[in-house]
Structure formats: C-alpha cells, structure tokens
C-alpha cells in the first residue's frame, strides 16, 4: 500500500497526522524541523521522536523525497536534473550557479497548456500538475541544496494554472516552521492568468515576473495565446492597483526576436504600456527550437534596446544566458523521456 509523503505538508497537516497517530501535539513541529531544516533522509533519523512514534509514522508515511533520476552538465556549470514524479511523468529543474548566488529553476507542471510559440515545453502539451510535494522535492533532493540562494518558478508549466499547490509550496518555503526563506529570494514567472494573478499577489509576497514579449496585443496573441483570454493591457491595469515599490519586485520578461519585436517602435510602446508601474524589464536572448521560425536578435540590438529603455526611465537588464548546450535555457525545458512516455 502506498505511503503518504510528509514533504509538502503544512504544519496544520502535520498536526493532523500526529493527532491521528496519538502522538503529542508538539511532535508536529519536531517533524517539520526534521523535514525542512535538518534535511533528514529517513524517519528513523528523527531522534527526538520516540521509537514507538517513529514506527507509527513509518507505518503510514514516508519522507516523500526522491533523488533525480538523471542529470546533464553544461560547460558553464549549469546542471539540469530530471525528476520522476510518477510512473510515466518527468520534470526538469535547472541549477544555475554564479559567483555570489546559486539559483534553482523549478517546474510546476508536466508540460504546459499555454502553447507559447517560442517555448519547447508548450510543444509537449499538458500532462499533469505537480503537487506541493513534487514541487518541493526539486529543492529537497537537489544535490547542491545547501548552496541555494534563490528559487525561480520559471521551469516547466504555468504556475498560476496550478495555483493551489504552488502557493502551498511557496508557503512552506517561506514559513518559519518550513524552510524559512525570505520571499525576496523567490520569483514566480507567469504569462498572466486572470483568475490566478490577483490571488497570487494578495496571498504571496514573492517577486513576480510577467512574460510580455510584445507590447502589441495582436502580436502578443500570436506569440502567446493566453493574451486572448487576459490582455496585457488589462493585466497592467490590474497590477497598477498594487504597490511594488518596496521589497517586492515586479519584472517583465521580454525575449528579443530578430526583426519581430526589436525595433524602436517596440521600445516606445513598452514605455507607454508600462508607464506608472514600478517595474523593470529583463531582456532575454532567444534560443532556436525545432519547427519555430523565430531567430534571436544580436547582442548589439539588445544592448541598444536596453539602453533606450533605461535612458527613458525604465530600468532594463539583459539576462545572462545559461545552459544552452544542455537545452536548459529559457524556453528549452523539454524532456526526451516525457515525450517518449506520451507516445507510449
């Protein structure tokens, strides 16, 4: 009989577990500490629980931590890990080390419904949403976990399309009984879904990054079908109702395509669209994917685009590209094993 995973449980849920097993009330906090702070590899290591209570716990539960089943290493130090989340489902997480920080790009779904033209994950179609356990396992089972400084929800899937489980995972990441991370260390990236965006802003203090890619609705809808359901102009109007001037950061992601969205008219329209918002723009280099007739703009074009926006008061950066040689860069998260499973 399958056992229930403890990883991904809130303190309230752990209190229900200990109550049902006849354990003392304080045992829930002890279990949470072992799970999220002390990084145990088995229930037997929870030594401040009595042997009897450990045996009771083991009878119905396990840690719910599963090591990656495969990995690929880039020449730039980036590592892509493959996690098996069920018999036929796989997701990837990408570890990105830098001089003074180490970031993990985490997945929220197997595949994605959004079908953005430039994204390999969307070409897979949608298979399943991850549980909080499966989201947090990408962190808990990471070999470099102790080096992590930041987490970005920018992997496979649309986080706002799996908001209950994503919010639960973020709560555990930031709760004092959980990992105890500052929300400033976590960024969620989204195409922007009407039903989820407002709830995320109001229930989480983590940074928010919106996939923009064109300031013109008709063109954005060609690149990102989600535009047809919730336009970027409506989204900006909603975002203006919230204060992003303090510790929380609002960013807009902008992949620069050669001859598509890289001219001065686009920069001017971006300034017009985002006027009045306390935000920044991250320019991203496009990496070619099979069957997509888009090409990345050159660095000179991207630099000019950045300088124009910044000189007109919109702080803009060019994001460093990492892991291209192992298909780990933005829009390239697509697993051969998942595609193989979908065919079977």
From Swiss-Prot:
Residues given in the record as S-adenosyl-L-methionine binding sites: 157-158, 189, 211-213, 287
Keyword tRNA processing included in the entry's annotation: yes
Residues reported in the UniProt entry to bind [4Fe-4S] cluster: 112, 116, 119
Record-linked HAMAP family: RNA_methyltr_RlmN
Keyword field: 4Fe-4S, Cytoplasm, Disulfide bond, Iron, Iron-sulfur, Metal-binding, Methyltransferase, rRNA processing, S-adenosyl-L-methionine, Transferase, tRNA processing
Keyword Cytoplasm carried by entry: yes
Localization per Swiss-Prot or TrEMBL: Cytoplasm
Enzyme Commission number, as recorded: 2.1.1.192
SUPFAM superfamilies referenced in this protein's UniProt entry, alphabetically: Radical SAM enzymes
Catalytic activity reported: adenosine(2503) in 23S rRNA + 2 reduced [2Fe-2S]-[ferredoxin] + 2 S-adenosyl-L-methionine = 2-methyladenosine(2503) in 23S rRNA + 5'-deoxyadenosine + L-methionine + 2 oxidized [2Fe-2S]-[ferredoxin] + S-adenosyl-L-homocysteine; adenosine(37) in tRNA + 2 reduced [2Fe-2S]-[ferredoxin] + 2 S-adenosyl-L-methionine = 2-methyladenosine(37) in tRNA + 5'-deoxyadenosine + L-methionine + 2 oxidized [2Fe-2S]-[ferredoxin] + S-adenosyl-L-homocysteine
InterPro entries, per the entry: Aldolase_TIM, Methyltransferase_A, RlmN_N, RNA_MTrfase_RlmN, rRNA_lsu_MTrfase_RlmN/Cfr, rSAM
Annotated protein name in UniProt: Probable dual-specificity RNA methyltransferase RlmN
Database matches in Pfam families: Radical_SAM (PF04055), RlmN_N (PF21016)
Residue ranges that the Swiss-Prot or TrEMBL entry lists as coiled coil: none
Top-rank lineage group of the source organism: Bacteria
Cofactor note: Binds 1 [4Fe-4S] cluster. The cluster is coordinated with 3 cysteines and an exchangeable S-adenosyl-L-methionine.
């Amino acid at each position: 009989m399958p056992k229930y995973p403890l990883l991904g449980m809130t303190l309230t849920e752990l209190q229900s577990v200990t109550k049902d097993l006849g354990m003392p009330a304080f045992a829930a906090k002890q279990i949470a500490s072992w799970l999220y702070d002390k990084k145990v590899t088995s229930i037997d290591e929870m030594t401040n629980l009595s042997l009897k209570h450990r045996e009771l716990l083991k009878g119905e539960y396990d840690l719910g931590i599963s090591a990656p089943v495969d990995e690929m290493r880039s020449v730039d130090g980036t590592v892509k890990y493959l996690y098996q989340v069920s018999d036929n489902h796989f997701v990837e997480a990408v570890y990105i080390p830098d001089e003074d920080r180490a970031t993990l790009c985490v997945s929220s779904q197997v595949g994605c419904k959004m079908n953005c033209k430039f994204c390999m994950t969307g070409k897979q179609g949608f298979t399943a949403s991850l549980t909080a356990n499966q989201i947090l396992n990408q962190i808990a089972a990471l070999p470099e976990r102790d080096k992590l400084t930041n987490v970005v929800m920018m992997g496979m899937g649309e986080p706002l399309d799996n908001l209950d489980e994503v919010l639960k995972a973020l709560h555990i990441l930031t709760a004092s009984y959980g990992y105890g991370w500052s929300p400033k260390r976590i960024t969620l990236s989204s195409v922007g879904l009407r039903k989820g965006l407002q709830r995320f802003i109001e229930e989480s203090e983590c940074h928010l990054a919106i996939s923009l890619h064109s300031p013109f609705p008709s063109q954005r809808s060609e690149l990102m079908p989600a535009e047809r359901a919730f336009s970027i102009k409506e989204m900006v109007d909603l975002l203006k109702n919230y204060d992003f001037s303090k510790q929380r950061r609002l960013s807009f992601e902008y992949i620069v395509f050669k001859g598509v969205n890289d001219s001065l008219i686009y920069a001017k329209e971006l300034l017009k669209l985002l006027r009045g918002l306390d935000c920044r723009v991250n320019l991203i280099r496009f990496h070619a994917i099979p069957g997509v007739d888009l090409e990345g703009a050159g660095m000179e074009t991207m630099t000019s685009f950045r300088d124009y926006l910044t000189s007109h008061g919109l702080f803009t950066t060019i994001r460093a590209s990492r892991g291209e040689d192992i298909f780990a860069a933005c829009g390239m998260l697509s697993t051969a094993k998942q595609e193989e499973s979908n065919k079977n």
